[in-house]
Amino acid sequence: MSSNTVNQRVNFASTKNPLEYPDFLEVQLKSFQDFLQLDTPPEKRKKEGLYKVFAENFPIADTRNNFVLEFLDYYIDPPRYTIDDCIERGLTYSVPLKAKLKLYCTDPDHEDFDTVIQDVFLGPIPYMTDKATFVINGAERVVVSQLHRSPGVFFGQSVHANGTKLYSARIIPFKGSWIEFATDINNVMYAYIDRKKKLPVTTLLRAIGFENDKDILEIFNLAEDVKVNKTNLKKVVGRKLAARVLKTWIEDFVDEDTGEVVSIERNEVIIDRETVIEPEHIDEIIDSGVQNILIHKEEPNQSDYSIIYNTLQKDPSNSEKEAVLYIYRQLRNADPADDASAREVINNLFFSEKRYDLGDVGRYRINKKLNLTTDMDVRVLTKEDIIEIIKYLIELINSKADVDDIDHLSNRRVRTVGEQLSNQFAVGLARMSRTIRERMNVRDNEVFTPIDLINAKTISSVINSFFGTNALSQFMDQTNPLAEITHKRRMSALGPGGLSRERAGFEVRDVHYTHYGRLCPIETPEGPNIGLISSLCVFAKINDLGFIETPYRKVDNGKVDLSENGLVYLTAEEEEAKIIAQGNAPLNDDGTFIRNKVKSRQDADYPVVEPSEVELMDVAPQQIASIAASLIPFLEHDDANRALMGSNMMRQAVPLLRSEAPIVGTGIERQLVRDSRTQIAAEGDGVIDFVDATTIRILYDRTEDEEFVSFEPALKEYRIPKFRKTNQNMTIDLRPTCNKGDRVTKGQILTEGYSTENGELALGKNLLVAYMPWKGYNYEDAIVLNERVVREDLLTSVHVEEYSLEVRETKRGMEELTSDIPNVSEEATKDLDENGIVRVGARIQPGDILIGKITPKGESDPSPEEKLLRAIFGDKAGDVKDASLKASPSLKGVIIDKKLFSRVIKNRSSKLADKALLPKIDDEFESKVADLKRILVKKLMVLTEGKVSQGVKDYLGAEVIAKGSKFSASDFDSLDFTAIQLSDWTNDDHANGMIRDLILNFIKKYKELDAELKRKKFAITIGDELPAGIIQMAKVYIAKKRKIGVGDKMAGRHGNKGIVSRVVRQEDMPFLEDGTPVDIVLNPLGVPSRMNIGQIFEAVLGRAGKNLGVKFATPIFDGATLDDLNEWTDKAGLPRYCKTYLCDGGTGERFDQPATVGVTYMLKLGHMVEDKMHARSIGPYSLITQQPLGGKAQFGGQRFGEMEVWALEGFGASHILQEILTIKSDDVVGRSKAYEAIVKGEPMPQPGIPESLNVLLHELRGLGLSINLE
């Protein structure tokens, strides 16, 4: 054990040179960056992501090729609203996507048409926040990565009912038709196109250019050619024919419709294949006029190729033309118009780049599998691919090759956010290109521009439906930072193009040896999704092809390379057959193994080998697990099933009022908080200039160069979130942990709160636990709690709920927010402001008015009395009804915030006033931009002083500052810096870098000013942006403080969960001999059968840590041993294993046996009794059965089911039973009569017929049975 204190923790890790964890959100952030490639200049962009989609869809031309629309570049402008604004107003955080398009005419007749270059708005793109989320309609969402079958070729095997082994090869492309080659029980090989159309493989070979039998047999080297003459033929008597002997002739006939003479080639089979040549065949062969015949080779081939001969026997075609026609008829069930169209259909299937795409991955996998050297740019199938696949399949039949394991991670790849968005954009752009083509054709003779051709809604509708409805776009789990980060690193096999729960078998769900270091074997949901949803391991990365890689250290001749160069990231395929040592294998300082036998891993085997045989070594013992599993101390002592529950339950831990980091951690807690980005962190080195509860200001250090190229001040302000609601109605309430004048370093965490303490993850509380039964109250995992825990708010959490009310214009008039509500007492509206919204600080009880609203009633003819009153008083107060938002039956809390958003509805005079304001805003913007440009020009003059231009060009490549000329202020004044190439302006590299940064910073600042201008104009002309049809929206936020109580669920980190059964007074709890009462009593019987001994290790080490004031880090599979525990309990003056005598709180007597008393980290989970408790007296009924609805959400009742009826029957309680089944449930008439009887105090009426019986009768009548009750 090393006694070094990392982050004030004693670390037990034995591994030397541990690898730094990668950024945990890299999988999401990098994918989105690669999708947009915003930091890459247009000319250097890779053909991937959005750029690839544009490149594939452009240029677009009309049908006559007169007009061409070309794509030059795309860019984005700053968002109109901040992320916080979007969350508050229910908007989508998006950026405008714009493309530079060029429209030109190729037709010389259109002389009046000039080439047009325009920036065209293509719609808003939801933009990923720095926390790797998307804000869609005010809610934070995550796009989960999908694990799906990699494109490529897969060889499989199945067994027919009669025991015959059948083999198949399936080619899966990114885009295009699937093709499968498969054998049948008659040893014939067929090709299946799109799993439907079946044809002999030789027919396909003919169609792709191997026209006759000779060509096909030569591929497999199966036949020899014999020249036809008597001498040669006599020599081959007794041998088998490999190909048919065909007589070919041309036949002419007259087409009746056209009168033309048409020639057709005819074939006649003289002798069939597989015929043994007899002497009498010689003359027939010579008479047929063939030049050569094919016969079987005498020496047998290494493999059995009889399947090819069998397939040829089944082949109905004799030439390429016949094969093409046959395939066309199979696919289309019709005859082709001509030979060319038939051939085109086959080419389009597999050889057309527009219709078929293997993708980089598919080509890579096919080349790898079949040992081909085809260029990676060839993304369609080739003849060579098809031949090699057939050859491999024949080897498979001859047991000379192996079938693929489809659960091997080399056959599964990850579709990350960027790829999923690219696919959606491809769909949107393909639709848009169709409409562009149509519009070009319609506007043939007009002068038009790119803007006239494009409809921006096309793309945004596809993108919006993806984020709103796709199974992989999910509402973010925001219970605590761990839940957030785990959700973003999740891998799902479900979703479009993936598996479905029902079809997924055991093999797909099971742990595979290739998951090691890539997908966590522990963290997966319990239930129907088990094994289909996994989590990425801590060190895993996803490469450009979408395969998951994990790091290893190279080992050469028994010596581990501990340098940076010795680190390699390998995919499952590259790791295949390598011998890999474990991460905790003891090493000498020079990297050699201490022991002469090393435990290692090779595929699914675990050999013990000599150090010289080892090829690689794990980088760390925790490499195998995900973040959540890595947070469980002593995981190595827990059963896997319980560890699974533990890692899942930590994600449900509710943020507490005061967070407390665990005494026994694993060392990953700090990294998790840093990478979750839920706290405020310093962006660089600097000094705290100002700090209070809501704001932190930092003055950052900047070099002279950074200062020179920047247009921003070095002082940056951060707002600290206070009582912000999360997706799960938890609270983000942060507090600063820094003081004015403190020096901060880059990445330093400056706040705490929201399950974080001192920069470390803090999900629960360290509590003193006794493992002993207590009066039966901890039977079956129940938990006994000390009242102190409740009183001192140790496990108290704050929950914030948002309630909103919308004001719309109805058919009968405008709704209105007001505190003046008809027929409501003054007492009920005392807390409402003039807009009818409850005041901040008001205590809410069930039934209280939160937001007052009146809505117009339907006009009905007034009675004479009403007419008289209206004539006298002239009021129309009776025309509105109360439509206020009231607190639900279980709602109690305090109003902590309120908001009102209004769309501006203006009269003529205020519109005129606004019109006068707009020019002022424009002038203000112009003056700010002029000042900004003045500063830019001044700085550019300094940078270019004495230097000569290397030629400055605009984005079209036209020179705007001539090569060889000197730079002048007038040159710079006339430049449009937003449309300029930033390549080398001078021959000084340093100056060029400075110029580039300066102009980029200028463009960024300019776009910010432009966005601010648009925002101001929008606020004046339209007001708050609200969803369609809504005029006002009021929101109130209610905070509820929840103490822990009986019925709440708690858990440790080892899957040891339970429900609080009793909160006991402090003086009645068992206490230690020094008088300390324990906080919590757990049942010791919950440990042995569950096999999660890790909790005992944790309790023992935790108590030693608490007594000594020390915190520990015990990494998984490399943590503290029993000897370490004993050493620390001895230091703390505690008995071994913390077996301590306790005294009974009631009598003060000592218990007979010592019990384990330790300090365990306990979590309060999101399953709280307050959310689940529910009672109904009257409420809604189901429309059809007329029975009460079920569930708390519907304000439903409990179902009195079949078994409960038996119970009442057993007691003979016939009247109660009759009541329950009729008037208390679905006897509609009886219900209302019973109500009348109760009100009037009369005896109960006789029950009628239950509605469910009527439903049954209607059902039977619907089946045509006439049933009447008598």
UniProtKB/Swiss-Prot annotation:
MF (Gene Ontology): DNA binding; DNA-directed RNA polymerase activity; ribonucleoside binding
Function field: DNA-dependent RNA polymerase catalyzes the transcription of DNA into RNA using the four ribonucleoside triphosphates as substrates.
Assigned keywords, A-Z: DNA-directed RNA polymerase, Nucleotidyltransferase, Transcription, Transferase
Parts forming coiled coils: none
Family to which this protein belongs: Belongs to the RNA polymerase beta chain family.
InterPro entries for the chain: DNA-dir_RNA_pol_bsu_ext_1_sf, DNA-dir_RNA_pol_bsu_external_1, DNA-dir_RNA_pol_su2, DNA-dir_RNAP_su2_dom, DNA-dir_RNAP_su2_hyb_sf, RNA_pol_bsu_bac, RNA_pol_bsu_CS, RNA_pol_bsu_protrusion
Subunit details: The RNAP catalytic core consists of 2 alpha, 1 beta, 1 beta' and 1 omega subunit. When a sigma factor is associated with the core the holoenzyme is formed, which can initiate transcription.
Pfam families attached to this UniProt entry: RNA_pol_Rpb2_1, RNA_pol_Rpb2_2, RNA_pol_Rpb2_3, RNA_pol_Rpb2_45, RNA_pol_Rpb2_6, RNA_pol_Rpb2_7
HAMAP family in alphabetical order: RNApol_bact_RpoB
Disulfide bonds: none
Reactions the enzyme catalyzes: RNA(n) + a ribonucleoside 5'-triphosphate = RNA(n+1) + diphosphate
One term under GO cellular component: DNA-directed RNA polymerase complex
This protein's name: DNA-directed RNA polymerase subunit beta
GO biological process: DNA-templated transcription
Gene name linked to the record: rpoB
Broad enzyme group: transferase
EC number, as in UniProt: 2.7.7.6
Transmembrane segments: none
